[in-house]
Amino acid sequence: AAALTMARAGLDVMMVERGKFCGSKNSSGGRLYGHSLEKLIPNFAAEAPIERKITQERLSLMTEGGALSFQYGSDKLENLKYPSYSVLRSKFDKWLADKAEEAGVMLTEGFLVDELVVEDGKVIGVMTGGEEFDADVVILADGVNSLLAQQIGMKKELEQKDVAVGVKEVIELGEDVI
């Protein structure tokens, strides 16, 4: 979204993606709030790879010994002007990157940003594949365990007690089943 916005503003934008394609390194799905993306790409839901419209809300409060859940469903959730959707990030991110490319973003896939180029305390570019690329603006999007943010002191290294390993399985069900 940031690359697309900057390209539309007339800036030269290079997006560096570590994976084979944007989204290939994502292993999760998520919830996409339509009001934000609608501003960026009007009528996005007609073409974006969304899974389902969110029509129910559930909040669970969990303790070591149990859980208490609240569920809310309403016609209002089904008829919102800007509904929210479930998405698989690997599909959605690729679609959004394609939109950015259409707007003029130069996308380089299969490259890892090895380090940030810093001069006089300011980030002035990135090193990737042995080459240096100068930049007026660098936006880090390398995930929760950002080694680049650690390099410049923006965040501390995560401690083992602060992370967990998750397992995900995608089960495809037809609309008639859900």
Protein language model regions, located:
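Short, hydrophobic alpha-helix immediately C-terminal to the catalytic nucleophile
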Residues: 3-4, 150
